[in-house]
Amino acid sequence: MTYAIVVADATKRYGDFVALDHVDFVVPTGSLTALLGPSGSGKSTLLRTIAGLDQPDTGTITINGRDVTRVPPQRRGIGFVFQHYAAFKHLTVRDNVAFGLKIRKRPKAEIKAKVDNLLQVVGLSGFQSRYPNQLSGGQRQRMALARALAVDPEVLLLDEPFGALDAKVREELRAWLRRLHDEVHVTTVLVTHDQAEALDVADRIAVLHKGRIEQVGSPTDVYDAPANAFVMSFLGAVSTLNGSLVRPHDIRVGRTPNMAVAAADGTAGSTGVLRAVVDRVVVLGFEVRVELTSAATGGAFTAQITRGDAEALALREGDTVYVRATRVPPIAGGVSGVDDAGVERVKVTST
């Protein structure tokens, strides 16, 4: 495997705050890698360090085999798209996309052909004569991506490009971004705090916390086999049954304690059958969230079941039920990998 980006032992401090703590990070050529983490985790600092917008205090940055640690951003061969799109308001969509090519004094015929192709690729062929204020937020971000791609960057860096858009538009654009990447195959690094976006779009996910990379792997790897409790908790809701972290949708709810469960795979474990009391039943479209209290410990936890299962069980507040985990992911760091404050922050509940 070849790597388009190699970050070696990068450290970055802002006074007493450690933004990057001896980070080692690689991006395979042609991949789309997501940097995922909470605010202050170091994900944007890492991206800006790769871009040359920030300089690491220690360590090196290599792009396609070239040490660019002290090379200015404009000479790194990168395309950069920010959360808040930067557009020339007095230029049309076509001229915005063509701007970088004109600065590089490319032939007019080449510029026209390149811009026409990119506008088609990003779905803006019919908008070339419009101005930025005549576009929707999603269309402006597509224009920004086209402009970044116009100069044939070696790598494309995206800093929460859809963060300022509403949920429905973000969902549409992340599916579009995945299709775009599959078409152009440029090495891409995407910063996001949206777990669903990272799982949906990326080939690989790097989870950051307090300036360190906690885990790097495919979406399936980091979700199904988290390196520690923080990774598991940050990638989705978590409950604790008999000391084991489990996903709410991996908790089976029944009326009787006879709940034999077949292991989902070789890594699945068991928490045994527990008795609980229903506190609240919340219908969420095709799913139902069941808020429960352990009869043994009084601890609160949550199960996520299908609408059909909920209707079959006819759950009501105050009902006594039995629960069992259908799958317990292996966690290298164990439950103790998250301190009490961390558990509260990432909404881990316990029984």
From Swiss-Prot:
Keywords: Acetylation, ATP-binding, Cell membrane, Membrane, Nucleotide-binding, Sulfate transport, Translocase, Transport
Pfam families linked to this entry: ABC_tran (PF00005), TOBE_3 (PF12857)
EC number, UniProt record: 7.3.2.3
Compartments where found: Cell membrane
UniProt modified residues of type N-acetylthreonine: T2
Reactions catalysed, as given in the entry: sulfate(out) + ATP + H2O = sulfate(in) + ADP + phosphate + H(+); thiosulfate(out) + ATP + H2O = thiosulfate(in) + ADP + phosphate + H(+)
Top-level EC class: translocase
CDD domains from the UniProt entry: ABC_CysA_sulfate_importer
GO cellular component terms given for this protein: ATP-binding cassette (ABC) transporter complex; plasma membrane
PROSITE patterns per the UniProt record, alphabetical: ABC_TRANSPORTER_1, ABC_TRANSPORTER_2, CYSA
Signal peptide span: none
InterPro entries listed in its UniProt record: AAA+_ATPase (IPR003593), ABC_SmlMolc_Importer (IPR050093), ABC_transporter-like_ATP-bd (IPR003439), ABC_transporter-like_CS (IPR017871), Mo/tungstate-bd_C_term_dom (IPR008995), P-loop_NTPase (IPR027417), Sulph_transpt1 (IPR005666), TOBE-like (IPR024765)
Annotated GO MF terms: ABC-type sulfate transporter activity; ABC-type thiosulfate transporter activity; ATP binding; ATP hydrolysis activity
Bilayer topology annotation: Peripheral membrane protein
Main location: membrane
Binding site for ATP: G37, P38, S39, G40, S41, G42, K43, S44
GO-annotated biological processes: sulfate transmembrane transport
Coiled-coil regions, chain positions: none
Family statement: Belongs to the ABC transporter superfamily. Sulfate/tungstate importer (TC 3.A.1.6) family.
Function text: Part of the ABC transporter complex CysAWTP involved in sulfate/thiosulfate import. Responsible for energy coupling to the transport system.
Protein name, per record: Sulfate/thiosulfate import ATP-binding protein CysA
Annotated organism of origin: Mycobacterium tuberculosis (strain ATCC 25618 / H37Rv)
